[in-house]
Amino acid sequence: MKEESKIVTSKFKHTPVLVNQVLEAIAKLPSELLIKGKLIDATIGGGGHSALILKGFPSLHITGLDQDPSAIDAASKQLLHFGSRAEIISSNFADFVPQEEVAFVLADLGVSSPQIDEAKRGFSFRLNGPLDMRMNPKKGLKADELLEKTEEKALADLIYKYGEEKFSRRIARRIKQDLSANGPYEGTSALAYAIAGCYPPKMRNGRIHPATRTFQALRIAINNELDALQHLLQKAPNWLLPGGVFAVISFHSLEDRLVKKSFLTDERLERITRKPIQADSNEKLNNPRSRSAKLRLAKKRNPNE
C-alpha cells in the first residue's frame, strides 16, 4: 500500500516517516480488529500519519494526543474533513487513559521537523532563537533556566546520560563559566558556539554538528522524554485488544534501547519483527529525518492462549 506522504498545514510542513511500513502493519491486523476500528496516535504532531491512516482505512477512528498547542492546532485543521473519525486531545501520552481498548497504538517519538524549523521554539542550533526547548511552551523549565539552576557536575552528568556526549564535562564547565562571567546566553546560536569551542579544532566541522548531542540532552531532560516513554511502554499494552499492535518510531539509541528491551521482556507483548524497520534509500533521500528512524512492532498476546 503506497501513499503520498507529504502533509502541509498552515503552520506545519511535515513529511511523516515510515508511512508505508505503518500502513502495512495496520493492513495486517485481524479483520475483526479493523472492523472495531479504533486507533491511538500517541504523538499526533501535525496529523501526518493519522491523515494517511484515515484515508487508507475508512473503517478506522483515531484518537490523537499531543502536548504541543501548535501541533494540536495543525492536526485539528489537517483532520477536520474526517469529521468524527478523528478526535484530538491535548495530553502527554504518559498521562492519557483511554476509554476503551483499541486495535493499534502508534508513537512517533522525538521532536518534529516543524518544531525544529521554528526558531522561537529554541530546539535548533542552526536557527537562532530563545533557549526554550519545551514541547509544551506553557509548562516546565526553559533551557536557559535549566542551565542556570543545574550545578556543573549534574549538568555534565545530564549531557552525558541523555546525549552520550564524551566531552560533557568540558561542555558543562564552559557553560557554567560563561553564565558566571556574562549572564544568560543570548540564544541558541551563542550556546551552540560555546559548545563547539569545547571540541578539538579538527572535530568541529564534521558531519554531525558539535552541539547536536548537548541539545538533544537538554531537550530530553526539559521534557522528561525518557520517563514519559517508560510510562507509555508500561501502559500502552493495556490499551490494546488481544492481537492489536503497538508501533513505536524512535530516532536515537536511548529511545530505541528502551523500546527494544520492553518489547523483548514484556510478557503481554510478542515481537512482530526482531530487528527494527528502517527507511529505504529512496525515503532517506527525500526525507532526511527518516535516516535515523527505527520502527519496532509488537503484538498484544491473547491471555487465553
UniProtKB/Swiss-Prot annotation:
Species whose genome carries this gene: Prochlorococcus marinus (strain SARG / CCMP1375 / SS120)
Biased composition (Basic residues): 291-305
Record's catalysed reaction(s): cytidine(1402) in 16S rRNA + S-adenosyl-L-methionine = N(4)-methylcytidine(1402) in 16S rRNA + S-adenosyl-L-homocysteine + H(+)
HAMAP family, alphabetized: 16SrRNA_methyltr_H
Listed GO biological process terms: rRNA base methylation
GO MF annotations, alphabetized: rRNA (cytosine-N4-)-methyltransferase activity
Entry's transmembrane regions: none
Gene: rsmH
Designated name of the protein: Ribosomal RNA small subunit methyltransferase H
Enzyme category, top tier: transferase
Family listed: Belongs to the methyltransferase superfamily. RsmH family.
Domain of life of the native organism: Bacteria
Location relative to the cell: Cytoplasm
Residues that bind S-adenosyl-L-methionine: G47, G48, H49, D66, F93, D108, Q115
